């Protein structure tokens, strides 16, 4: 059966008050010792895939995203969705709306891949497509694959 259903959990843009609170949390997190988070990049077929590999016990904050995304998550993490905190264990594929900003706390090693449309030909171009806050992005070395395949 090909019924279309509306998924209960989406990653949404926070309201202005919540966004301001998240930015305050970001400022506090930057004062703490930092953990290196390995980031892998894939640019292929008009899409940018960005995978973060997070160890257990990490609190991480994302940037405000300029585009709608798909988030593929595997692990054990409490995540702020834009309106509430939810614990996700195992494997999940979640829709993310433009303007969202997430906050995560890992309970076990967690891998998160965000996929978004992008005509970028470099990681720098893809990151600029993704957010206006590129200076806040994790940049630990990981795999970079650029196929030159177009959509």
Model regions: which residues?
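Double-stranded beta-helix
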Residues: 107-151
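Conserved short histidine dyad/triad with adjacent acidic residue
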Residues: 45-65
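Glycine- and acidic-residue-biased ligand/ion/polar-headgroup-sensing regions
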Residues: 65-83
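Short glycine/proline-enriched turns and hinge-like loops at secondary-structure junctions
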Residues: 63-66, 105-108
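A short, N-terminal "cap"/entry segment at the start of jelly-roll beta-barrel domains
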Residues: 1-51, 133, 139-151
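Tight coil/turn sites that cap or link beta-strands
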Residues: 55-57, 91, 97-99, 107-109
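Short acidic-glycine-tyrosine-enriched beta hairpin
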Residues: 78-102
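Conserved hydrophobic/aromatic beta-strand scaffold that supports enzyme active sites
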Residues: 49-53, 70, 85, 93-95
């Amino acid at each position: 059966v090909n019924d279309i259903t509306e998924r209960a959990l989406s990653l949404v843009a926070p309201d202005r008050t919540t966004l301001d609170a998240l930015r305050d949390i970001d400022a506090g997190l930057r004062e703490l010792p930092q953990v290196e988070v390995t980031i892998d990049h894939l640019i292929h077929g008009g899409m940018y895939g960005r995978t973060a590999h997070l160890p257990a016990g990490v609190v991480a904050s994302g940037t405000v995203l300029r585009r709608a995304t798909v988030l593929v998550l595997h692990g054990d993490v409490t995540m702020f969705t834009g309106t509430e905190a939810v614990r996700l264990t195992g494997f999940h594929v979640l829709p993310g709306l433009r303007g969202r900003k997430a906050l995560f706390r890992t309970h076990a090693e967690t891998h998160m891949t965000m996929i978004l449309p992008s005509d970028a030909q470099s990681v720098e171009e893809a990151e600029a497509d993704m957010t206006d806050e590129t200076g806040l992005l994790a940049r630990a070395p990981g795999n970079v694959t650029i196929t030159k395949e177009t959509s």
